[in-house]
């Protein structure tokens, strides 16, 4: 059947004098219509009124979507011919200059129902939280660069062996029949998947989002007659829910040693993470890498080479600059040490992890400004051996000695090389050639993010605390991550670390946005070099927490309550840090870019620093209990 378009202004029969009146009226209407016609489109031969522009644009967009769904990807011309069969060569559309009517006629042809698909055996439903399947030939044509195709009918991909509590049940497809169709951008090839719903709890509020998809018959036919269909993501919220569910389901599969199911989920995680932005995408990428290392049993190597040792120091320095966590740790510990040294003429600090010595210039300067003059200051720095046998600890001592000389502080330094703190003995920390006629040294022991590493070796922490107790320090300052990554099952540890590092990455994003850094396209320019390197610094911790076990897993963080129990059981009593340290720490954060999101809290005499409502690090001070003193 041919469709003809009749001009509204066409001629009729001979009507005598009435004809002249009608022509005059038509001429007047034509002049009015000519005034309303868009001039730019009229120059191209199309008659479109300015008032009809919005309607024509909407119809063109619908036409483009309908024709674009015809399989412009790897299916080739065959899919196009089958889907747009109503636009055959024998169909004629007259007068395309009247663009509105012409587009409407095209849409009427496209909206005709297609031929029914042949019946096929229904594909198995997935027990996973994700209702997506990866494509083969059309991979990479849509939003994501998709991984290799995974056969959804295989027992590996069907996650039935995992009775995950975090998996969202699939909804009945019949409930979606009355729902209005949504605009979806897809990869190449026809799109179909089962309809599913997911929900997440955010502060006690349940949020749900739904994926619109074709009925199961279409999915079964596509699985039987063509390549696997691409992923269809309606919005980033739905993809984010799927991403979290995939991470948790993969961790549960690892715990159950169902590595075939875990491998299938590991392949989904990068695809789902690529739809996210900001901190969530970065955290998911690091956790996905850590899970992949655990599934494929590819453990991260220890920092044994010269390059790794130098890189670790570089990451630590960038982490110090990008966020206030290390600054807070150094400041609160120094404040406690300064108060303990009040009125003392000879002081000695033992630093269990001196690294680049960034903590001590501030304390030296505070002692130099003390009324009555600075005391004699001795510093013992402990550090690991260097792969190239260089004396890096001595180089740190030279720099600190030069600084102390400029502010006129009597300074002595000694470096102790130890592969682990458990190798230290009490005599190594005692004063050399101590003159009994002089005032005795007052000792302070400082540990920033060091004690948790000892938990990987049975009995190591108890030995180190016994060594500390033997030298009778006036104060012991301890800074540790406020997290529990050292107890429970692997899934519990994974879930806790996912929450912890998500908050940590959020704080980095907030600090970077508050500092007004460059918005160039490159990652280093967009987030700043310090922020990018700090993310790598945290990513290495994530990899150790998730991918490693046994003695290799050194990032065994524990909460403040757990450290209070350990130190109290080893003969130490807590020292209240006081309100002065709290006020000064709050002032320090106010000066830091993006400090609005950071929160300092005082908890049982200890200070914590967190992002919004989540504490992330904690500083505590201790002394040898009277009953435990030798």
UniProtKB/Swiss-Prot annotation:
Result of altering residue 255 to H: In strain: cv. MO24W
GO cellular component terms attached to this protein's record: nucleus
Variant or mutagenesis effect after changing residue 390 to I: In strain: cv. EP1
Biotechnology: This gene, also known as the 'green revolution gene' has been introduced by conventional breeding procedures into several cultivars. It produces shorter plants, increase grain yield at the expense of straw biomass, and are more resistant to damage by wind and rain.
Main localization, broad class: nucleus
Region ranges (Disordered): 1-35, 161-222
Record's compositionally biased regions (Low complexity): 165-176, 191-222
Protein name per UniProt: DELLA protein DWARF8
Originating organism: Zea mays (Maize)
């Amino acid at each position: 059947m041919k469709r003809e378009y009749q001009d509204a202004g066409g001629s009729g029969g001979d009507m005598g004098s009435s004809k002249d009146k009608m022509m005059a009226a038509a001429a007047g209407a034509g002049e009015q219509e000519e005034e309303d016609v868009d001039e730019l489109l009229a120059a191209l031969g199309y008659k479109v009124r300015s008032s009809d522009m919005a309607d024509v644009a909407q119809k063109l967009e619908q036409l483009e979507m309908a024709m674009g769904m015809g399989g412009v990807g790897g299916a080739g011309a065959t899919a196009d011919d089958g889907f747009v069969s109503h636009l055959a060569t024998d169909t004629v559309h007259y007068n395309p200059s009247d663009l509105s009517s012409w587009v409407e006629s095209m849409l009427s042809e496209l909206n005709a129902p297609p031929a029914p698909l042949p019946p096929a055996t229904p594909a198995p439903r997935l027990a996973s939280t994700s209702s997506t399947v990866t494509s083969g030939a059309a991979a990479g044509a849509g939003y994501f660069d998709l991984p290799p195709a995974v056969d959804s009918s295989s027992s590996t991909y069907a996650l039935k062996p995992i009775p995950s509590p975090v998996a969202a049940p699939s909804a009945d497809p019949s409930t979606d029949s009355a729902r209005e169709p949504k605009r979806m951008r897809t990869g190449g090839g026809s799109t179909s998947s089962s309809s599913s719903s997911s929900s997440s709890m955010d502060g006690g509020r349940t949020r749900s989002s739904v994926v619109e998809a074709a009925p199961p018959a279409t999915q079964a036919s596509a699985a039987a007659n063509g390549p696997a269909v691409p992923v269809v993501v309606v919005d980033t919220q739905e993809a984010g829910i799927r991403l979290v569910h995939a991470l948790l389901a993969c961790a549960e599969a690892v715990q159950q040693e169902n590595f075939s199911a875990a491998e299938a989920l590991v392949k989904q995680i990068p695809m789902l993470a690529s739809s996210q932005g900001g901190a969530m995408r970065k955290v998911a990428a690091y956790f996905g890498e850590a899970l992949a290392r655990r599934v494929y049993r590819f453990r991260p190597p220890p920092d044994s080479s010269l390059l790794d040792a130098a890189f670790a120091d570089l990451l630590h320095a960038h982490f110090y600059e990008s966020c206030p966590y290390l600054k807070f740790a150094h400041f609160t510990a120094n404040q406690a040490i300064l108060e303990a040294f009040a009125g003392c003429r000879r002081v000695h600090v033992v630093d269990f992890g001196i690294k680049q010595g960034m903590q001590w210039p501030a304390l030296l300067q505070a002692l130099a400004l003390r009324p009555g003059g600075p005391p004699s200051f001795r510093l013992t720095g402990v550090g690991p051996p260097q792969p190239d046998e260089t004396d890096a600890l001595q180089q740190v001592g030279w720099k600190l000695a030069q600084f102390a000389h400029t502010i006129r502080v009597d300074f002595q330094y000694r470096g102790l090389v130890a592969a682990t703190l458990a190798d230290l003995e009490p005599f190594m920390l005692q004063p050399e050639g101590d003159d009994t006629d002089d005032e005795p040294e007052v000792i302070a022991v400082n540990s920033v993010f060091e004690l948790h590493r000892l938990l990987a070796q049975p009995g190591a922490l108890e030995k180190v605390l016994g060594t500390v107790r033997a030298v009778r320090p006036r104060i012991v300052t301890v800074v540790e991550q406020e997290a529990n990554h050292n107890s429970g099952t692997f899934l519990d540890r994974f879930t806790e670390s996912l929450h912890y590092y998500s908050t940590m990455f959020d704080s980095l994003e907030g600090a970077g946005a508050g500092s007004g850094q460059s918005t160039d396209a490159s990652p280093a320019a967009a987030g700043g070099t310090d922020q990018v390197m700090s993310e790598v610094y945290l990513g290495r911790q994530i990899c150790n927490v998730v991918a490693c076990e046994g003695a290799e897993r050194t990032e065994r963080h524990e909460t403040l309550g757990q450290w209070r129990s350990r130190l109290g059981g080893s003969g130490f009593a807590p020292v209240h840090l006081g309100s002065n340290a709290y006020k000064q720490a709050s002032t320090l954060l106010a000066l830091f870019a993006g400090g609005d999101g950071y929160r300092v809290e005082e908890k049982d005499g200890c200070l914590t620093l967190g992002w919004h409502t989540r504490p992330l690090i904690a500083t505590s001070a201790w002394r040898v209990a009277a009953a435990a003193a030798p």
